[in-house]
């Protein structure tokens, strides 16, 4: 049980903050700032986290977009934290994410994301996490379609925890209705490749092959254009898949953000 809880927390963190979105980069010298809050709940482990965050992206040169996202973790589940991964001592700034995207063609871009280890939030244990991949997007009438394929890897290993490679892929459809409201639906998938190593509650080492273990994260949401430069966005996400990835119970994740064009 302990191993599954730590794994589910770590993989949940990987899925929580992906690339900024699945659509083309902004025009040259355009930018966006976002202020939001996320909520994660996983019943069997009593994991409940509130995650305020602040982020900004800017196209510094034609087709080149740079971004940073700063999460802050507020532990709402004292039982889980004191019993398992001790997150009660890690409330505060989470691992910042640095992101870069380059638009190769109007339909294709590549991305590179780096999680910087400033905290032991979510079981990453001070490890750098690198994600890289490509995105394809296209407009189909009233539907803006975006998709992504990427690979995430922990750049360091230690005796306490070592995670396998994670293959990420997903797609989203935004429905343009010529009104201020834009509904969207999507799903992200996570497939593990390799071994996980670590220690259980008794201090005994384990080394398990998790290749092929997977989870799918479907989500729905709504965007409301308050003004041409100000958008309110809300979404809800759940997960289906193997318990080693998502935990014993079906998790629930919600997100509310305000996006401001700059």
Map each language-model feature to its residues:
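Aromatic- and glycine-enriched pocket-lining scaffold segments that form the walls
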Residues: 160, 164-166
């Amino acid at each position: 049980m302990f191993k599954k809880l730590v794994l589910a927390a770590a993989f949940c963190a990987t899925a929580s903050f992906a690339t900024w979105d699945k659509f083309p980069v902004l025009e040259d010298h355009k930018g966006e700032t976002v202020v939001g809050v996320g909520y994660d709940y996983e019943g069997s482990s009593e994991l409940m986290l509130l995650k305020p965050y602040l982020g900004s992206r800017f196209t510094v040169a034609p087709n080149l977009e740079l971004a940073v996202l700063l999460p802050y973790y507020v532990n709402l589940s004292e039982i889980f934290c004191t019993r398992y991964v001790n997150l009660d001592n890690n409330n505060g700034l989470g691992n910042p994410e640095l992101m870069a995207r380059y638009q190769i063609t109007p339909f294709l871009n590549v991305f590179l994301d780096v999680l910087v280890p400033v905290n032991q939030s979510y079981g990453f244990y001070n490890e750098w996490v690198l994600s890289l991949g490509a995105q394809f997007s296209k407009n189909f009438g009233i539907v803006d379609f975006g998709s992504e394929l990427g690979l995430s890897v922990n750049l360091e290993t230690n005796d306490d925890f070592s995670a396998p490679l994670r293959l990420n892929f997903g797609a989203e459809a935004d429905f343009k209705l010529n009104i201020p409201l834009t509904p969207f639906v999507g799903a992200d998938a996570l497939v593990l490749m390799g071994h996980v190593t670590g220690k259980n509650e008794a201090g005994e080492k384990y080394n398990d092959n998790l290749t092929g273990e997977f989870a799918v994260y479907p989500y729905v949401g709504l965007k409301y254009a308050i003004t041409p430069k100000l958008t309110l966005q809300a979404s809800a996400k759940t997960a289906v898949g193997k318990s080693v990835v998502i935990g014993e119970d079906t998790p629930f994740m919600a997100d509310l953000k305000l996006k401001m064009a700059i």
